[in-house]
């Protein structure tokens, strides 16, 4: 019996009359490009934020596509508020743009699955930072907060300038510097983060994510920022 794999669709477009070309996120294979055969009854099933399960036949050549068959519906996460949907759209766009193809991503997949199940209006900012930090780890760009770029230990009572490759001790009291105590919270549970910690860590992940994006623009981030500005 063929094994079935859980997956989420990140992006899809029509490919010929009865097929979709999809980018999917899986635990076992990371991100994959694949073909899915469709009919009138199943077209609406293949959407982002829907957990699916199916048989995956991996592409045999680098220039060919994987195929997904015998697809089952598992669970939908569309019953969320608008801010949560924008947040999840942002996460999907990050995975779609940044994650490499065909690489096992069990930790990141489990974080993604956890966020889909648990995100709400009270915690979405925390969970977005959690995912950004895990994604950076998966990309080999994990944030190291034990020492600064000069090799000196991060001090709770000192301020630091954020750089894409680390942190530099700030002796000029710059407005955009952040405290060492907040930096160290990156390695601690979300429950230990204060509002000030969250703001500081958000600035750190913004710099690091922008660095790996290398100029790519996130449509979902703009939608999220515009929506939050309207609510002020």
Curated annotation (Swiss-Prot):
The keyword DNA damage applies. It comes from the Bacteria. Belongs to the RecO family. Keywords: DNA damage, DNA recombination, DNA repair. GO terms for biological process: DNA recombination; double-strand break repair. The lineage of its organism: Bacteria, Pseudomonadati, Pseudomonadota, Gammaproteobacteria, Thiotrichales. This is DNA repair protein RecO. InterPro entries: DNA_rep/recomb_RecO_N, NA-bd_OB-fold, RecO, RecO_C. Involved in DNA repair and RecF pathway recombination. GO terms for cellular component: bacterial nucleoid. Pfam families: RecO_C (PF02565), RecO_N (PF11967). The keyword RNA-binding does not apply. HAMAP family: RecO (MF_00201).
């Amino acid at each position: 019996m063929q094994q079935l794999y859980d997956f989420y669709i990140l992006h899809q477009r029509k490919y010929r009359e009865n097929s979709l070309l999809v980018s999917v996120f899986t635990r076992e294979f990371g991100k994959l490009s694949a073909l899915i055969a469709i009919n009138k009854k199943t077209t609406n099933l293949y959407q982002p934020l829907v957990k699916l399960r199916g048989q995956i036949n991996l592409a045999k050549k680098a220039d060919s596509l994987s195929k997904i068959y015998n697809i089952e519906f598992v669970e939908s996460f569309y019953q969320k508020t608008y801010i949560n949907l924008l947040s999840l759209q942002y996460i999907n766009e990050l995975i779609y743009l940044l994650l490499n193809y065909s690489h096992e991503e069990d930790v990141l997949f489990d974080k993604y699955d956890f966020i889909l199940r648990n995100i709400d209006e009270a915690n979405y900012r925390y969970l977005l930072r959690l995912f950004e930090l895990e994604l950076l780890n998966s990309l080999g760009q994990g944030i190291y907060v034990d020492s600064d770029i000069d090799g000196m230990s991060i001090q709770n009572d000192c301020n630091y300038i954020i750089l894409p490759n680390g942190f530099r001790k700030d002796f000029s009291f710059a407005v955009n510097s952040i405290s060492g105590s907040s930096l160290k919270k990156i390695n601690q549970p979300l429950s230990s983060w204060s509002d000030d910690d969250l703001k500081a860590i958000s600035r750190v992940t913004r710099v690091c994510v922008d660095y790996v994006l290398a100029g790519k623009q996130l449509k979902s981030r703009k939608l999220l920022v515009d929506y939050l500005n309207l609510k002020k």
